[in-house]
C-alpha cells in the first residue's frame, strides 16, 4: 500500500519542477497508485492545503531556520511544508504523527542529513505553541503571509478595491471551496436528483436563487457515484452557470462556445436549449476536445459538435450564430481557491493575456448574427485580463 504522505511530497516536488496543473497531476497520480479511498482523501487535503498555504509555511521555515531558505534541500522543504501544514491546519492528525512521519519521509527520500533538522524544527514549533509571529511586518506583508498570497497581488487588491474588500477577498481565497453542480434537466429534476444522491449517502441541497443548481457537501470521488455515471448532473461553479444563463439560449438556435473545454458551459447551454438546435463547442487543444465529447455522451447530449479551433483566428467554416459565449483564457485569479498554484505566478506571466483576449473577442463578434447576443466573461479580480482598447461591433 502506498504512503499518502510520500505521495504528496513527490507531487509537490513535481509541481515545483514543472508547470503541472494541480488537479490533473492529482488525478493522474491517484489513477496509478494503490491508495485507499481514505488515504486519497487525506492526500488530496494535504496536497491542496500545502499549495494553498505555501507562502505561510515558507515564512515559518525561514523564521525558524539558521540555514538560508535557498540552500535547503528541496525534499526537506517539501517535508517541512507537509509537516507544518498538518500541525497547523489538520486537527485530526496527532502532533506526534505529524513529526514522526515527517522524519520517516527523510529516510524514504534519502535525505538522511535532514532528519535532525526536520525533527528539531517541527518539535520547536510545537513547543512554541504553534504560533506565527508577524512582529515587525508591514500591513501588506502581514496580509500576504497570513493569507498566503503574494505581496504584489495583495498590494494590487488593496490599491484597486481598498483594504476592507481586499481582506475579504483574501479570506475567501483560502479554505475548502464548495462544490456546485448543474442538474441535467434532460434526464431528471432537482428533487429527484437530491433523492438519488441521498440514496448513495451524498449530502446535497438545492442552491437558493439559482434554479437547477445544487451544492454538494463532502462529495468525495464524485465521478464514481452512480448518479454521476448515469449523467444526472455535471460539476460546475456558480459563476460558470451564470455565464450560460446570461447568454439565454433557446430551442433550435445556433450557439458557439468558443473556449469550451472541459465542457461544463456547453453542457448547461445544451440543457437550456432542450437538446435541440446546434451547439459548437471548441477548444484550442485537440486533446481537450475529447473531454467535451465524453461529457456530452455521459449526459445524453446530442446537439454538441466538439472541435479543435483557434478562437483568436476567424474560421469561415463556422456558421453565423444566434448566440456566442466568449469565456476567454484569463489569469484565473478569481478561482485561486480551486487552483492555488495560480497565485504563485509572477505578474509577467499574464502580460500577453489582454491582447489574446481582445483577439478572441474581436473574432467571436464576427460570428454573431445581426440582433444576436455575445457574452464575454473572465475569471479575474484584478485589472490584468481586460481588453485595453474599445471594440466596435457593427
Indicate where each model-derived feature is located:
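S-adenosylmethionine
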Residues: 1-389
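Hydrophobic alpha-helical segments, chiefly the membrane-spanning helices
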Residues: 393-394
